Amino acid sequence: MRKLKFICQLLIAFIIASLGYNIFYEPHQETVRAAVRQQFNQAGGAGQEAGGQLKITMLDVGHGDAILLSTAGRNVMIDTGDSRNLAQLEAGLARAQVKRVHTVFVTHHHEDHMGNTLKVAGKYGVSRIYDSGYPNARAANSVRLNQVLRAGNYNNRVLRAGDTVYLGKNYYVEVLSPDASLSRELAANLNNTSLVMLLHYGSFTMLFMGDAEKEIEGLLAEKYGARLKADILKVGHHGSRTSSIYRLTSRVKPAYALISCGPFELYHHPNKNVVGSLRHLGARVLTTADNGSITVLTDGKSFSVETER
């Protein structure tokens, strides 16, 4: 009888432990926390191991941004490109053998960044969409996306500076901009409403600037200083002269500067002075116009960069 009682107690303990595991440990659930930290590297600094290899692909989608982050069968996108270039986006995702996109970050509501978001959400089973919450009233795709998100679909959350989105083991993004106190004057330029995010994967870091322009870059340089240091910089506003001030880039000091842009004749991106300044800092500058899709591979300790051409 005692033996039977002991077995029953073990069984009950096992059931309780299993329930606790399922309730409190959700390895694929993303969480957002208002981060109150003195240093960015407290949760993912040097020596931190990540969960396997992270593959970051800046897809060649012509003029626009569409960046794919893949690890352990889980896919995240930062922007989805222009709706006019949907075929290029889908071809890039097909080459990457993407069947599902779990999460999308919309940096801001310009067509060349968010134009395919709802199409991606519908086709690839997106479960969560983050954005900065500033719609473009003059663009139908933005108006529609804003309506869908503000209605609470796709587990939407508006992000602000200080938020942290955890994506996996020692794998998270820190939101640096827009600040909750962003002025109406600055927000009138949608580029300045861009989500600026610092990605951490183990000790590897990559700074995504969206289309943030000089005014925002100056504020970031003043607020964060040397904490902006990153291995790779996703250059702001396609390498336009409106962005990439030395005050910011000299704090980032990237080994690589990646630019997503279409043919030079279209918008004259990237600006030659911007490219020259980045090279002066020691960065190797790559563009999707010249190099095709650009892929970064990292295990959280070291990284490599490959190009399509």
Tell where the protein language model's regions lie, with residue ranges.
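Non-globular, low-confidence helical/coil segments that flank catalytic cores
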Residues: 2-309
